Design a protein with these regions (language model features):
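Catalytic machinery of carbohydrate-active enzymes
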Residues: 2-355
Length: 355
């Protein structure tokens, strides 16, 4: 009824890592239908003057991509990286202030806005909107709601799925499939601009020649690993590398100071000292990134640095990509249950394979 299947079925034929049954077991069907029906009615009313587009044509040269609801850095990177398929068109971005900063100097996005009032509706012949959620539509309703639109996710509403592949396959579909699945699997990765200034700043850090980068701290309690000191101890004891660089946000400053005091000759910290993009350049200079699930894991995939990700409950396949050497370790109960031995063993394998 009304296309309810769209909430759990992808609009394209390619298969992506997605755990639909798990979502079904968690959320009863009546709740899922009521949520869909509410969004359906709101969308039909709010976008009644906006023609829904299922094919991006050559005439659609001026595009405003609106990415509003899922504004975490990792989600944003996964959702927007398929913009590489729109190169050659004028593409602007409307997103939240927090995420807008990482796209400065982008090779595809021309202008970046953080409020729909900044956008001139006469500048666009197509909107790409993230989804039909009410919050997303409210971000541009009014001056822009008469412009034809295409939706990335539409009504799709599943918790755990690989957003990056969804985005690439969906934009490829909207462009009438110029690329086959094998090509997309080979090239699909997060797209993150690293400017000449970012490179210059990081060059000034005089980083070691050969080092592992480790992200410490975390925003989410369930995604925060607390045994980095033990991991570092075993890495150094085994002689895997002699130098380790700590990165992350300022909330981990105290932890980084403790680790540096314990290993003053082997560990250096840039925790809380760099922008996201500058941190990505540090990762680019490393031979491996070790981290819990988070935005910097996607930065590693963007610069194609091998990555070992630690996950709580979430299957690594919904975050990792085929185009970069990445591996995940997961524990369903607690991320701290992932053994130090399994982490260090995988680090050895990833580095030996790289060499």
């Amino acid at each position: 009824m009304l296309g309810f299947y769209r909430t759990y079925t992808t609009p394209f034929e390619e298969k992506i890592p997605a755990f639909v049954d798990k979502f079904f077991s968690r959320v009863p069907i009546y709740k899922r239908f009521l949520r869909f029906f509410s969004r359906y009615v709101y969308t039909e009313i709010s976008l009644r003057n906006s023609k829904k587009i299922e094919t991006i044509l050559p005439k659609h040269k001026r595009i405003l991509w609106i990415q509003w609801v899922d504004a975490y850095l990792g989600d944003s990177l996964m959702d927007l990286s398929s913009r590489v398929f729109l190169s050659g068109r004028q593409v602007d971005l409307l997103t939240k202030e927090y995420t807008s900063r990482i796209y400065k100097g982008d090779t595809v996005f021309n202008r970046i806005f953080t409020n729909s009032d900044q956008c001139n509706p006469n500048d666009y012949d197509l909107l790409i909107i993230d989804s039909y959620r009410e919050r997303s539509i409210k971000s541009f309703i009014g001056r822009l709601s008469h412009i034809p639109h295409a939706s990335l996710f539409g009504y799709y509403n599943v918790d755990d799925f690989n957003r990056l592949y969804f985005s690439f396959y969906r934009i490829n579909q909207l462009l009438s499939h110029p690329y086959n699945k094998q090509y997309i699997d080979d090239i699909a990765k997060p797209l993150l601009p690293i400017t000449a200034l970012d490179i210059s700043v990081v060059e000034g850090f005089s980083l070691p020649d050969r080092f592992i980068a480790i992200v410490i701290g975390g925003v989410w309690k369930e995604r925060t690993f607390h045994k980095w000191t033990d991991v570092i101890k075993d890495i150094l004891f085994k002689g895997i590398v002699e130098k380790i660089v700590l990165i992350g946000s300022s909330d981990a400053k105290e932890e980084s100071n403790l680790i540096c005091r314990r290993y003053p000759n082997n560990v250096v910290s840039f925790v809380g000292e760099c922008t996201f993009n500058q941190t990505a350049q540090i990762i680019n200079k490393s031979i491996l990134l070790i981290c819990a699930d988070g935005g910097l894991m996607h930065a590693a995939n963007a610069v194609r640095t091998p990555v070992l990700g630690l996950f709580h409950e979430l299957d690594p396949s919904v975050r990792l990509v085929k185009s970069n050497r990445s591996f995940g370790l997961m524990d369903k109960l607690c991320i701290d249950n992932i053994s130090i031995k399994s982490i260090v063993t995988k680090v050895e394998c990833l580095i030996s394979d790289e060499e």
